[in-house]
């Protein structure tokens, strides 16, 4: 091109140089006139080819008189006035009028500035802009809308994001949020899940133990009643924590407007439970009993309760099996004739003791029943619904409204879903388990009295 022959004029116009774009000069015989690049012609702006700055170095190493350098405005300042001055003669309604603005916006937002050598910048001996783009193989004109951020820019962005992320993670707000998780329902759910697993493991170990086979008084001495007691006490402690939180929540709701809030889909409302079992709720207790029970927690509580019933039934069956196979021994108590002939100074300590095995089994049964009764007390189960009391299976003809009016939400939930609906029909496994435990308790007590001649 003719502009390349003259070293005093740059090979790229000021507009293309400011955007680091390839400048293609139009043919001189075109109607647009000489020395105009195709980009400026398309944008309908003035195309200016600025003079080069003369090199300070000479081939012979001699200093030449310096020529005054023309003061060039920065490219960032010259390009906007050129574009703005052309608005007066542009037809803003035509689609082609907005092409330069799209090119400018795309180049400013997506084009990455290329590195410039400060030693050769502004030096006439350095390669020209046209030669630089030609060396890169950019022989065709670029479409600015197809440009995308380079990997270097993305790496810098990701590096800056990674730098900001650690301080956010190190802030103590996350620890403050996670600290109360130990007192939230998920923590109770974890405890109940672990407890159910331990109960099932204990039941399986007792079923596979030698105590289930031929009864032996010596083996019975090593019976692990401590594990059963520990499971009952752990269950009672967990229930105490859960019921305490529900009571606090109920008190907090009753202190509000006095109306029961609408529970979520996974919550069981007290009024819904009572309406499902056709019991009229006391209107004076509507605000205080409006607490809701978390469904997973309630199901785990019921699972622990039924699993504990199975475990107790298994333990009492082992005790009954050993007692029934004990040999018949004469009564250790003296007859009335022997007592009459005895001297006047007979003392309590001189009386013979009963069978040691029967005494220990009786003590173990009493301790286990006390622990299980503590669990039912936390539930608030009345005597009519107790699994270890005499009136457990006598369900027909009972007034449930009289019992439920003085019980807790846990009681009503269990009565409807476990005790009442199943005990009356007597067609489910849960009912059979509760009946079996109650029957085991009564038969075991009768057998102990028989063996001890009580």
UniProtKB/Swiss-Prot annotation:
Assigned keywords, A-Z: Activator, DNA-binding, Metal-binding, Nucleus, Transcription, Transcription regulation, Zinc
Name of the molecule in the record: Trichosetin biosynthesis cluster transcription factor TF22
Region of interest: Disordered: 51-89
Residues within the DNA-binding region(s): 13-47
Entry GO CC: nucleus
Comp. bias intervals (Polar residues): 52-61
Coarse class of the protein's main subcellular location: nucleus
One GO MF term attached to the UniProt entry: DNA binding
Role summary: Transcription factor that regulates the expression of the gene cluster that mediates the biosynthesis of trichosetin, a trans-fused decalin-containing tetramic acid with antimicrobial activity. Directly activates expression of only the three biosynthetic genes PKS-NRPS1, DA and ER, while TF23 and MFS-T are induced by the final product trichosetin and not by TF22.
Source organism (scientific name): Gibberella fujikuroi (strain CBS 195.34 / IMI 58289 / NRRL A-6831)
SUPFAM superfamilies, per database record: Zn2/Cys6 DNA-binding domain
Compartments (UniProt record): Nucleus
Comp. bias regions, Basic and acidic residues: 63-74
Entry keyword Zinc: yes
């Amino acid at each position: 091109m003719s502009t390349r022959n003259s070293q005093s004029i740059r090979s790229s116009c000021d507009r293309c140089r400011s955007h680091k774009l390839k400048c293609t000069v139009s043919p001189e015989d075109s109607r647009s006139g000489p020395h105009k690049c195709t980009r400026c012609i398309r944008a309908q702006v003035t195309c200016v080819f600025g003079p080069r700055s003369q090199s300070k170095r000479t081939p012979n190493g001699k200093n030449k008189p310096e020529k005054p350098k023309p003061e060039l405005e920065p490219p960032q300042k010259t390009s906007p006035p050129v574009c703005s001055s052309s608005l007066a003669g542009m037809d803003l309604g035509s689609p082609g009028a907005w092409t330069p603005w799209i090119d400018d916006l795309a180049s400013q937002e997506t084009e990455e500035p290329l590195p410039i050598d400060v030693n050769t910048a502004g030096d006439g001996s350095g390669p020209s802009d046209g030669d630089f783009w030609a060396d890169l193989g950019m022989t065709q004109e670029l479409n600015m809308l197809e440009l995308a951020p380079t990997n270097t820019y993305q790496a810098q962005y990701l590096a800056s994001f990674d730098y900001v992320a650690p301080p956010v993670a190190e802030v103590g707000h996350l620890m403050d949020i996670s600290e109360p998780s130990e007192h939230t329902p998920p923590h109770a759910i974890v405890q109940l899940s672990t407890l159910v697993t331990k109960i099932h493991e204990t039941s399986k170990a007792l079923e596979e133990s030698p105590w289930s086979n031929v009864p032996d008084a010596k083996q019975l001495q090593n019976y692990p009643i401590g594990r059963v007691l520990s499971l009952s006490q752990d269950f009672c402690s967990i229930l105490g924590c859960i019921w305490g939180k529900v009571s606090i929540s109920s008190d907090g709701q009753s202190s509000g407007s006095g109306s029961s809030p609408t529970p979520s889909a996974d919550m069981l409302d007290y009024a819904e439970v009572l309406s499902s079992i056709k019991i009229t709720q006391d209107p004076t207790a509507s605000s205080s009993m409006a607490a809701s029970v978390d469904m997973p927690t309630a199901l785990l509580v019921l699972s622990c309760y039924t699993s504990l019933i199975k475990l107790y039934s298994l333990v009492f069956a082992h005790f009954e099996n050993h007692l029934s196979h004990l040999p018949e021994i004469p009564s250790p108590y003296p007859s009335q004739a022997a007592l009459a002939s005895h001297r006047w100074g007979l003392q309590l300590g001189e009386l013979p003791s009963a069978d040691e095995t029967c005494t220990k089994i009786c003590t173990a049964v009493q301790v286990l029943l006390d622990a299980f009764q503590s669990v039912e007390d936390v539930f608030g189960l009345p005597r009519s619904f107790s699994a270890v009391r005499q009136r457990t299976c006598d369900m027909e003809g009972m007034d449930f409204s009289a019992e439920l009016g003085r019980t807790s939400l846990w009681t009503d939930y269990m009565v409807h879903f476990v005790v009442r609906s199943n005990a009356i029909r007597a067609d489910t496994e849960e009912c059979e388990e509760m009946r079996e435990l109650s029957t085991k308790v009564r038969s075991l007590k009768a057998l102990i009295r028989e063996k001890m001649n009580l």
